[in-house]
Amino acid sequence: MRANRNEYVDALMTRRHNGLVKVLTGIRRCGKSYLLSVLFKERLVAEGVPEDHIIEIPLDKMEFAHCRDAVRLGEQVKAALVQDGRWNYVFIDEVQLTRKVLPPDVDLARIAPEDREDAYLTFYDTLNDLRQTDKVDVYVTGSNSKMLSKDIDTNFADRGFQIRVHPLSFAEYCEAKQPEDKAAALSDYLVWGGMPLAVAEDDENARARYLVSLFDEVYASDIKKRYRLKDDYVLKRLIDVLSSATGSLTNPHRLRNALESVLKAGPSDHTVANYVEYLEDAFLFSEAKRWDVKGKRYLDYPLKYYSEDPGLRNARLGFRDVEPSHMLENVIFNELCARGCQVDVGVVDVGDRRHEIDFVVNRVPGKLYIQVALELPTDEKRRQELLPLRRSDDFFRKMLIVGRYGAPRLTSDGIVEVGAIPFLLDRTILDKALAG
């Protein structure tokens, strides 16, 4: 079983030798290390790069534990460089494990308390130094909030480029599993998702145990350690609430009320908002804001949250209430994000009633409104689903993703209708719709 993840490898290949540090971020266990150390490395070697010109530093391995010092990391890499006029490729895995270092000639007592943090050397200093070394191309992976977009933008300025890596998409899932029945494969994907090791596991009980363990042994533990939480009980209950509310409108106050019904004494709205931010920072959930289509403005609350992977969401709920229709909406949201789109939830006022467009999709060169439905069994259901698209009162393209199969077709009122499987497997369908 293998997914070649060509979109990511191609993105890395096109950004070689551009003078920037290439930073692969994403949820832990989504395959960043494999992408870099196996797939990208194979492509480089196939194009003639000698293997001794590829320096790999997996910081999560005991063999390289000594490199978790920011200064020693740089020294280790420079000692391994081949000086023959050809490019060296440096792969540093889990770079956030690197510790900051105080230079020996710096006396903190002579520095104002508010400036002391700047006295330390961090992995950002190491990476920026390596980036400026002749014929050195730097690639790193990071999994948690030490490698956030805002941190990368601040510390690298215009010297770093972030590539967000997601779990296997449905297309990558099919590439790896080679299913004959795509409809059955989609049903399986809506339950188990695309975490690579879960996809590779054929035994459903083992697959379920693995997905459940990720929350307790990896994600919740990481967040507790990173933010120095006294315990992770409230955090785990919040994960449960967000998982059960996937794709539903909510806000911190509603989440607090839901927690209060479970805990009998809920945390404050402020604490809930902070915890939600921690979960987003760990790439477990993504926020979708609401966009007033006719008023052309964002609405503050409520908003929606989607899980990074349907299998993780279902595992958190014990694989009860899988809700295939909601999971399909979640999968389409993730697919749009992975394809580089900005995705909001649309609001359309019709008379005195407020209707929803599942997704308002923005990406150069255009905008697209999308409704998603696993099935529309009656004409009335179909009319209700299409109403907000028809009453948006603008010229942007509209799409209805309905059912599993169904080649793209244009309806009499100009709406592109397509099945979920063709949409997820053929990227050109979205490209053409956005291009108008």
Summary of predicted features, one role per range:
Residues 24:
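Hydrophobic anchor at the beta1->P-loop junction of P-loop NTPases
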Residues 55-86:
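Short glycine-rich substrate-engagement loop in P-loop NTPases that contacts/grips substrate
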Residues 96-139:
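Conserved Walker B catalytic segment
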Residues 204-366:
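Accessory nucleic acid-recognition modules appended to NTPase machines
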Residues 405-436:
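Domain-level recognition of nuclease-like catalytic cores that cleave nucleotide substrates
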